[in-house]
């Protein structure tokens, strides 16, 4: 009964039942409402022009408002924002009804990442947007706790790259300029305008949160790719980052994303030494994993624990695994939660208990799918007894397609 609020997850659900790529499906929100020990479920499409006019990736090309809105949903300043990284955000209400386009009173005229960060100390929402076709290839934005866009900065990059995620700390933002490079010549042959080109190098850009392009310090790292980050924080003259890092990347259809062990992410730690101008890089575990999360009240601060979804690699194609992982980040020690045989996991979202006494006093929520029975369910796991059976399972009255990211919104 302490768990009261809305769990909502976004994902790709093409109206026709078919899409050329799983990234192109229409955004559908799946909401589970919890109150007084009872649960109810609702699902809704995000009614953007992409949905209303039955558009596809080509017919919506160049229209920032025509968003699939299919990747994430984030709560900030009383608004729920449905996000997809090549488009503007769309606002929905807690009943999952579409409210309309959110361009911050006309101040946002570029795409917005699906992975903004809300600072737990200031309430600010920080985000970026990247462009595949025209300079500036990267823009940075800062939104006040009241929802006003108060800063925008153009950031210089030598070439257009896919920048899916990033990092923040108490005083800095960290951009990841990694070598998935936009090249429209690839689209005809691979179905994706991106290619992995390690010869372009990889680097991390550190900028004060209220800084601009001239303040960015770039630090070279080994070529790699990171779809998602756990967290980052400052410690003396260093910035410590925990990421799901893969040595290489493949970005065609979902089957083509998996090209062997080097294309699967694992937990790594990067330590940026601001005084020496260096970066140390260290793999902490062999477990294949992605979709990392922490307790959101520690975003940009030192978090002891991180949670992620296992990726199954002992099959021909990359598959959502049967386990969730809880990491003690500093040591890399891992605790596994087995969801069940032939159960496909989902992103683990942390929901804190009211007035917690420690960081992991709460629950992990994950929307999972039993492959044989086609039963979807929301599992609720005690984060402090992570390897034990779930404290509750909520059966969803219909199959929920595999999806992406979600949020817990406490009442």
Question: For each predicted feature, which ranges?
Answer:
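Beta-propeller domains
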Residues: 1-411
């Amino acid at each position: 009964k302490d768990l009261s609020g809305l769990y909502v997850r976004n994902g790709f659900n093409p109206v026709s039942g078919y899409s050329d790529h799983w990234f192109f499906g229409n955004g559908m929100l799946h909401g589970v409402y919890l109150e007084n020990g009872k649960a109810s479920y609702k699902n809704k499409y995000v009614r953007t022009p992409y949905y209303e006019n039955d558009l596809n990736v080509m017919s919506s090309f160049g229209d920032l408002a025509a968003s699939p809105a299919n990747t994430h949903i984030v709560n900030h300043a009383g608004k729920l924002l449905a996000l997809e990284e090549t488009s503007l955000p769309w606002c929905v209400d807690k009943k999952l009804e579409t409210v309309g386009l959110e361009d911050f009173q006309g101040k946002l005229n570029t795409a917005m990442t699906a992975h903004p960060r809300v600072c737990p100390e200031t309430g600010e929402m920080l985000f970026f947007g990247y462009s595949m076709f025209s300079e500036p290839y990267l823009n940075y934005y800062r939104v006040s706790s009241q929802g006003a866009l108060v800063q925008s900065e153009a950031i210089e990059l030598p070439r257009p790259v896919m920048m899916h995620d990033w990092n923040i700390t108490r005083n800095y933002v960290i951009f990841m300029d990694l070598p998935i490079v936009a090249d429209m010549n690839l689209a005809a042959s691979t179905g994706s305008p991106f290619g992995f080109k390690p010869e372009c190098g990889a680097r991390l850009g550190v900028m004060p949160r209220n800084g601009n392009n001239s303040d960015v310090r770039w630090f070279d790292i080994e070529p790699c790719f990171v779809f998602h980050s756990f967290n980052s924080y400052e410690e003396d003259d260093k910035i410590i980052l925990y990421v799901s890092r893969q040595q290489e990347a493949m970005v065609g259809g979902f089957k083509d994303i998996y090209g062997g062990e080097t294309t699967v992410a694992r937990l790594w730690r990067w330590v940026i030494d601001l005084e020496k101008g260096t970066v140390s890089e260290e793999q902490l575990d062999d477990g294949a994993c992605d979709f990392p999360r922490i307790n959101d009240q520690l975003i940009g601060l030192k978090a002891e624990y991180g949670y992620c979804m296992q990726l199954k690699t002992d099959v021909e194609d990359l598959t959502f695994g049967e386990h969730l992982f809880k990491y003690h980040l500093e040591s890399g020690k891992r605790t596994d939660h087995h969801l069940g045989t032939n159960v496909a996991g989902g992103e683990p979202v942390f929901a804190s208990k009211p007035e917690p006494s420690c960081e992991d006093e709460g629950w992990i929520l994950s929307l999972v799918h039993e492959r044989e029975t086609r039963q979807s369910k929301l599992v609720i796991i005690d984060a402090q007894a992570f390897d034990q059976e779930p404290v509750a399972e909520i059966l969803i009255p219909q199959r929920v397609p595999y999806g992406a990211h979600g949020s817990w919104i406490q009442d």
